[in-house]
A protein has these predicted regions:
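Aromatic- and acidic-residue-enriched segments that line the glycan-binding/catalytic groove
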Residues: 103-117, 159-195, 235-278, 332-343
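Glycine-rich, aromatic-flanked loop segments that form ligand/cofactor-binding clefts
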Residues: 90-99, 136-195, 231-234, 315-320
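Bacterial Sec-dependent N-terminal signal peptides
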Residues: 25-53
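Active-site-adjacent "subsite" loops/lids of carbohydrate-active enzymes
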Residues: 48-70, 153-225, 280-288
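Substrate-binding cleft/loops of secretory-pathway carbohydrate-active enzymes
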Residues: 160-163, 240, 313, 318-377, ...
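Substrate-binding cleft of secreted/luminal carbohydrate-active enzymes
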Residues: 354-468
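Aromatic-lined carbohydrate-binding/catalytic grooves of carbohydrate-active enzymes
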Residues: 88-132
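Catalytic domains of carbohydrate-active enzymes, especially glycoside hydrolases
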Residues: 74-101, 225-229, 356-369, 438-442
Length: 468
């Protein structure tokens, strides 16, 4: 994720529960008086959770909020109180932004504390320096727990640098020996290392064993904090053109059983092909679908390692991931967040029969779904509606992940600036019940948007209506 700027339910629930209990008791008595060949009645293993008991997460992007929080515990206390008063139960505080530096303590070699982040200040994109010496993450933990909020650490995963007009940051810029960690993209000009492509976020190659070890070691240090959960963001490949390094080529050929791909990379993906090109293909190159399967396995295996790393330090920390809800095209970044019980190949031509095996939902304690639809598309059953994203996510995860929460990006949802402010405000209100009714919780990105447009009251109205 990235920030850009430009009723009567409780009574019904209790009544329904009482009917279930009474019916179960009567059937128990009948069964006790009957023979073995009587009817076998089955009942749901769980009773639907009331919305009031479902978590409501708000994400706190590091860069976007840095001007407020980098050096002020008072501002942290102020805004966490606003989140609590609005009805949010959980915060996700970003402590490893896209440059790959950190806002907590770690002894892993090569890791560095964030010195500055680029943020919009009074209409100008500027450097915001961190001069405070107190522990950034610990400040959120202390105040969050004091307020009764659960505190999760948001962790940008497969990133190692960021270059902009303000300057370059991250281990990939600081240490030239780590260039092989950077992803190599299949461009029209040839396979090119990310560090030779100019500015922007620099992704690691997820298939690189050294990268995986580096990330897992950092996660172990993060797990030493008294946090309630860890949410991995960008736990993925950089895009459809990634990764075509020799490291990944050899691993893929081994995955194929030792096959040598003669026309590399065109037998997988034509040089420079984009997602638009891929989605327009009537037939795929020879190894394309197997390549998608392989990439999904790479991410599955990494997620298993990351979970083990966290749990080895503190088994009580909830391990989670943020993903985009657009599953139909999320193969672009090599991620299968569904359950292995969801047979992807039955629905999508790009999926092999074995693609489903690398759905990682069962590895998670919590899954945040970006239900990033337009404010004009809150309700529905399909992708690109908020409610549809959440319903589909629950179906695809098949109960493997016990907590699936989804919700909107309330700042980047109207790229054409065609929706009125009143409609946006109403969409925030409506989004809460639309998403919470469809899954296990609500998730809003990002705190900065509620602050900038003074929209806390609409989030509160939506939460109050959803849980009444």
């Amino acid at each position: 994720m990235q920030v850009f700027f430009p009723f009567m339910k409780t009574i019904k629930f209790i009544a329904s529960y009482a009917v279930i209990l009474l019916t179960s008791f009567i059937l128990f008595l009948n069964a006790s008086c009957s023979g073995d060949d009587g009817p076998n009645y089955e009942f749901p293993d769980t009773i639907p959770t009331e919305n009031s008991k479902k978590p409501r997460y708000i994400w706190i992007d590091a860069a976007a909020n840095f001007n407020d929080f980098a050096n002020s515990k008072e501002n942290i206390a102020r805004d966490l109180t606003l989140a609590k008063d609005a009805g949010f139960t959980d915060i996700v505080v970003d402590i490893r932004p896209t440059n790959g530096d950190i806002l907590f303590q770690s002894s892993v070699a090569g890791v560095q504390q964030v010195e500055w982040l680029g943020a919009w200040v009074n209409g100008n994109y500027s450097k915001v320096y961190r001069t405070a010496t107190w522990d950034y993450l610990q400040a959120f933990i202390d105040k969050g727990h004091e307020l009764g909020l659960k505190v999760h650490a948001g962790f940008n995963t497969m990133v190692g640098g960021n270059g902009s007009t303000l300057g370059n940051q991250g281990i990939l810029y600081r240490d030239n020996t780590k260039k092989s960690w950077a992803t190599c993209d299949n461009l029209s000009t040839g396979i090119t290392n990310a560090m030779d492509q100019g500015s922007g976020t620099k992704f690691f190659n997820p298939a690189n064993d050294d990268v995986q070890t580096y990330i897992c070691n950092i996660l172990k240090d993060l797990a030493k904090y008294d946090i309630d959960g860890i949410i991995l963001d960008r736990g993925r490949f950089g895009g459809i053109q990634s990764d075509f390094s020799e490291t990944t080529r050899q691993k893929f050929q081994n995955y194929l059983g030792g096959v040598t791909i003669q026309n590399y990379p065109s037998d997988i993906l034509p040089e420079g092909a984009t997602m638009s090109n891929v989605m327009a293909m009537s037939t795929y190159p020879a190894y394309f679908t197997k390549w998608l399967e392989f990439r999904a396995k790479v991410i599955y295996d990494f997620m298993a390692k990351a979970r083990n790393a966290v749990k080895s330090v503190n088994s009580e920390i909830k391990f989670g991931v943020y993903v985009g809800g657009w599953y139909s095209s999320y193969y672009e970044v090599g991620v299968n967040w569904a359950s292995p019980k969801y047979n992807t190949a039955s629905y999508y031509k790009w999926a092999t029969v074995s693609y489903k095996n690398y759905g990682f939902a069962a590895l998670l304690d919590q899954l945040l779904i970006g239900a990033y639809a337009s404010p004009l598309h809150v309700y529905g059953t399909t992708e690109w509606t908020m409610q549809g994203f959440c319903k589909l996510a629950k179906d695809k995860t098949k109960g493997d992940c016990p907590m699936v929460a989804g919700g909107p990006d309330v700042g980047n949802w109207d790229s054409s600036n065609s929706v009125s402010q009143d409609d946006e405000n109403q969409a925030i209100i409506n989004s809460v019940s639309a998403c919470m009714d469809a899954c296990d919780g609500y998730f809003l990105f990002d705190m900065i948007h509620l602050k900038m447009a003074n929209q806390w009251t609409y989030a509160k109205q939506g939460i109050d209506l959803a849980i009444e």
